[in-house]
């Protein structure tokens, strides 16, 4: 490639705020894989937030880029998977498969789309030093003739419109609102944008923990569960943002609750043998968790915790939950899915327009 901006490039990031700030440009926060796309003639590369190439996993995007995008460009955006008027992140995760034959099959059966929201380069021009208002205008021109695969994200400078997006379209899979100062230059790996996301709370059972990478005397993360209507304990996610002193104190406190796997509801080895999907989810199946130790220490389900989360993806927290407080006053069996707040239904993600 011979572009003014070359891969790999870390995307510009956002920091969380509680309210949508005034006086900026606003966009929906799409729920998918962040990717910077590079096209130089017949060459196309899809980068990721971790600067790992994703090109081989989305051949349909590569093919569409050759017909829908300018001949030489670098575009920041989100790879998403539309399904039944919402975004399906679980199905999108399945696209990261090591087998080329399965990649080809999924590309045909569940094709992805690319939502473009920033421009880093066009032709011979580097746009990273230009203000966002100028980059946005150039991006609109660059995508004027785009086809069905590449889409320009809606944007507005009207605060009430941004607030409406935030409240109305969560149920379609939108992840909140992004705010960008109009004079903002493109700053890779810097948290200079702003994001506002939904926050909810849930009381969960702590049913296990993983050790911290520092050693065998500190907790790395706590595994959370909620009870089904039939009384089985379902795995819903983890919390892990603790100071080191708290990690060590938790390790000591939890030793009295350590159980064996034989009668633990999350005996993955036995369950995975009977359920290939469970084996994929907890035992691997994509390059992103290759080599990662997914083992854990089982606990009797007696410790309860209140956590903050943004939204669910299927039956699990979409992102890592955040610790709020311990709940010694609650009974474990009261920690059920019934307490969860469902987002309002949205008719379609495509209705998120100015």
UniProtKB/Swiss-Prot annotation:
EC number: 6.5.1.1
UniProt entry keywords in alphabetical sequence: ATP-binding, Ligase, Nucleotide-binding
One of the GO biological process terms: DNA repair
PROSITE patterns referenced in this protein's UniProt entry, alphabetically: DNA_LIGASE_A3
Active site per the UniProt annotation: 29 (n6-amp-lysine intermediate)
Loss of function: phenotype: Not essential; a double ligC1-ligC2 mutant grows normally, no effect on NHEJ. In a triple deletion with ligD NHEJ on blunt-ended plasmid is 90-fold impaired. In quadruple ligB-ligC1-ligC2-ligD deletions NHEJ on blunt and 5'-overhangs is 0.22 and 0.12% of wild-type respectively; only 4-fold decrease in 3'-overhang NHEJ.
Cited InterPro entries: Adenylation_LigC-like, ATP-dep_DNA_ligase, DNA_ligase_ATP-dep_C, DNA_ligase_ATP-dep_cent, NA-bd_OB-fold, OBF_LigC-like
Gene Ontology terms, MF aspect: ATP binding; DNA ligase (ATP) activity
Gene3D superfamilies: DNA ligase/mRNA capping enzyme, Nucleic acid-binding proteins
Nucleotide-binding keyword on record: yes
Domain of life assignment: Bacteria
Swiss-Prot/TrEMBL catalytic activity: ATP + (deoxyribonucleotide)n-3'-hydroxyl + 5'-phospho-(deoxyribonucleotide)m = (deoxyribonucleotide)n+m + AMP + diphosphate
Function description: DNA ligase that seals nicks in double-stranded DNA during DNA replication, DNA recombination and DNA repair. Has weak intrinsic nick joining activities and accumulates DNA-adenylate. Acts as a backup for LigD in the Ku-LigD-dependent NHEJ pathway.
PANTHER family xref list: DNA LIGASE 1, DNA LIGASE 1/3 FAMILY MEMBER
Similarity annotation: Belongs to the ATP-dependent DNA ligase family.
Name of protein: DNA ligase C2
Source species: Mycolicibacterium smegmatis (strain ATCC 700084 / mc(2)155) (Mycobacterium smegmatis)
């Amino acid at each position: 490639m011979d572009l003014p901006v070359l891969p790999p490039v870390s995307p510009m990031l956002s920091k969380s705020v509680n309210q949508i700030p005034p006086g900026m440009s606003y966009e929906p926060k799409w729920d998918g894989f962040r990717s910077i796309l590079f096209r130089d003639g017949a060459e196309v590369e899809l980068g990721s937030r971790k600067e790992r190439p994703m090109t081989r996993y989305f051949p349909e995007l590569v093919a569409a880029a050759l017909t829908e995008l300018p001949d030489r460009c670098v575009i920041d955006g989100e790879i998403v998977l539309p399904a039944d008027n919402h975004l399906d992140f679980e199905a999108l995760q399945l696209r990261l498969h090591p087998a080329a034959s399965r990649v080809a099959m999924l590309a045909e059966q569940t094709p992805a789309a690319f939502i473009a929201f920033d421009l880093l380069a066009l032709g011979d021009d580097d746009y990273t030093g230009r203000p966002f208002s100028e980059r946005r205008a150039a991006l609109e021109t660059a995508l004027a003739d785009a086809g069905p695969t590449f889409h320009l994200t809606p944007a507005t400078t009207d605060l009430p419109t941004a607030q409406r997006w935030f409240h109305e379209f969560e149920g379609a899979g939108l992840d909140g609102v992004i705010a960008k100062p109009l004079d903002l230059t493109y700053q890779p790996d810097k948290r200079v944008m702003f994001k506002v996301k939904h926050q909810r709370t849930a009381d969960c059972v702590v049913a296990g923990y993983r050790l911290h990478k520092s050693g065998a005397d500190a907790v790395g993360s706590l595994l959370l569960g909620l009870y089904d209507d039939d009384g089985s304990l379902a795995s819903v996610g983890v919390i892990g943002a603790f100071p080191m002193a708290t990690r060590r104190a938790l390790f000591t406190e939890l030793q009295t609750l350590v159980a064996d796997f034989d009668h633990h509801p999350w005996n993955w080895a036995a369950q995975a043998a009977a359920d290939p999907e469970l084996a994929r989810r907890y035992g691997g199946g994509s390059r992103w968790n290759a080599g990662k130790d997914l083992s854990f220490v089982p606990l009797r389900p007696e410790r309860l915790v209140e956590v903050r989360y943004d939204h669910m993806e299927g039956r699990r927290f979409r992102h890592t939950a955040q610790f709020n407080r311990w709940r010694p006053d609650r009974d474990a069996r009261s920690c059920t899915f019934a307490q969860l707040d469902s987002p309002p239904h949205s008719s379609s993600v495509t209705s998120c327009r100015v």
